[in-house]
Amino acid sequence: MQRLTNPRTLWPTLILVSGIPRIAGAFFLPNAFGDAYVYIRDIGTMSTKLSHGTFALTDLYGFWLPLYQFISAVVNIFIRNGFYSGKFVSALFGIGSCLLVYSITLRLTANRTAALMGFGLIALNPLHITYSASAMTDVPHAFFVLASLYFVLQRGWVLAAVFAALAGITRVESWMFIAVIPAIQFLRERRISITALLILLIPPLFWFYISWRATGNWLACFVQRQYYHDWLLAMNPALARFSLPSVLRDSAILIVSTDIAVLISAFVAAWFAFRRRYITFTRPGMPEEWRMIRAPVVFFFAFFSLLVTAYLTHQQPMIFPRYGLLLFSLGIPILMWTLLRLAQQNPQRARLILVSVIALCVFDASVELVGSVGSLNQTSAQRAVADYLHAHVDNNANGFIFSDEGTVSVMSGIPEGRFLTSSDLPRDGAGFLAFLKEKHVEYLVFVNKGDSTPARLFPELQTGTRTELFAPVMHSSSRFLRMDIWLYRVNNGAVARP
């Protein structure tokens, strides 16, 4: 296959095009999801221990795997702002992901125009920009996976294993590379690199050891995750079963976030690459570009199958837009490769195919842009309530706050032990009120959710009605996407009276 060299000015241009919106977003856009504020808290805690020299290996243990938090904590030693350190690190990984998509596409297609189109598709994607500016693991994890794929295409199996291992210390789903990369190498070269295999085994062994050192149970993290999963289904029984509206909603979210054209091209490329007459990687006379496309297809469908299986077995009860980001990143080189193959096989329809793909990509980007704006509106409403709590709650007091809006709780910066949720309190009216009094609950964050006890017992609170028990202190809402939050001061004196 022909290999192209890049003009000297190309890389700086690509870095600027991908970097400007992501670095700016890190400073000016809010985090796209409430989990980001938990990451920020963990980054701050870890950074403080690193600065004071009290950091221990067991401090890596937590609900999530620790690599992203650790990298951000090291950066925060110099930046000294945990909020922006996590966002800045994610933005850098987002820039790197864009550059890797360009490099992988160029390697697959030997066509710079196709590579630049693929780069533009990810560099200007609203969802990718939004999450590159958020302190979360989705984009850093995608970077490590893309880097691993790049070295697989180069047959650099040890380096591919190194980046796959880094992905495996970022998110647990990348542990499947223990099987995926050796399988690809065996099918390609009829051998397996023992060094690469040993490197791939490091993430699970490392995490089991950390869990054992921190808790005495090498599976403690998975026990904790299963407990959270069971609690989530208990609090939201609708998530434990499929309904047509929920399946349609989740399917639409996954399809749009992955990109319709990308998803279709992945299935087309899989059919091209694995049809019967090209059944083995090593078949004599098989064109190199047909061999090479198989690795990206295997990567794509490994993660796609894992996500779909988790959803169908209720291990992943709902689909969020960010779940499609990795598939989108892996699928762009496949899309460009498929476009070129279809154009070669049917030149008369090449223009029609290109226009159709562009139309689908523009449609997807438009939907994602609208969704990102709505998500930012929701975050602004949540931030207003969180800021009020942060300013008015005395951290030295022994009172509690009731909140079924977890994002508000995390955003407030108040220790999570100060918050109570519906899962902590009795569900009957008398028991609920007695518990408020017993725990000295000072504030109640009211959201009209089906699983929220206050929403069921006191429906009048959704309109800001003042009662003997609850006095409204602020209201924050967004019209698109809908978010409506009332903050009430609890009158414990009235609660105490029969």
Each PLM stretch: what is its role?
Residues 20-21, 25-28, 191-269, 300-307:
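Membrane-lumen/periplasm interface segments of specific transmembrane helices
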Residues 132, 138, 167, 176, ...:
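Hydrophobic/aromatic-rich transmembrane helices and adjacent perimembrane loops
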Residues 1-2, 153-157, 176-204, 208-209, ...:
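Perimembrane helix-loop-helix junctions
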Residues 16, 182, 252-297, 301-304:
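Hydrophobic, aromatic-rich transmembrane alpha-helices
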Residues 356-409, 419-424, 430, 436-437, ...:
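Membrane-embedded, lumen/periplasm-facing catalytic core of multi-pass transferases
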Residues 25-37, 48-73, 77-78, 84-87:
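Membrane-proximal lumenal/periplasmic loop motifs of glycosylation machinery
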Residues 11-16, 162, 178-179, 197-205, ...:
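Signature aromatic-anchored transmembrane alpha helix within multi-pass, membrane-resident enzymes
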Residues 33, 127-138:
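Short acidic/glycine- and proline-prone juxtamembrane loop motifs at membrane-interface regions
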